[in-house]
Design a protein with these regions (language model features):
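Single conserved hydrophobic/aromatic residue that forms the stacking wall/gate
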Residues: 1-7, 11
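Core RNA-modification/binding signature centered on pseudouridine synthases
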Residues: 15-129
Length: 129
């Protein structure tokens, strides 16, 4: 999230609670049914994924969100980021993340953030034997 980018409209220059975002990130780690974090209307029955790490970092005016996992649902990263943004804006509490995951209700998760500023950094594959 960069205050100089078009994505800045999403949080309208409000101060984000970076520490709460970092705290909330840990609730995504592990194997969960991420049904609440995929676009509504998306086909596919299996929404179980494993998130190995979610890191929230501050670099100047930017907040960087890095996710590592075994796969991602359609718009999952954008919705997780939108949910972390809601935590940073103090619309929801960090511990609410576990309830959103349990309830599997898309309407409880954050907005789907725009793709602007979203980058795929690395893809790793296990060796095939």
């Amino acid at each position: 999230l960069d205050r100089s980018s078009a994505a800045s409209d999403v949080y309208k220059r409000q101060q984000l609670n970076y520490q709460k975002m970092k705290e909330a990130a840990k609730y995504f780690v592990g194997e969960h049914d991420f049904k609440a974090f995929k676009s509504s209307g998306t086909s596919g029955k299996n929404s179980v994924r494993t998130i190995y790490n979610v890191e929230v970092k501050k670099e100047g005016e930017r907040i960087i969100i890095e996710l590592t996992g075994n796969g991602f649902l359609y718009n999952m990263v954008r919705i997780i980021s939108g949910t972390l943004l809601d935590v940073g804006l103090e619309k929801i509490k960090p511990e609410d993340i576990s309830h959103i995951i349990e309830e599997k209700d898309r309407t409880k998760a954050g907005k789907t953030l725009p793709a602007h500023g979203l980058y795929l950094v690395n893809v790793k594959y296990e060796e095939w034997v």
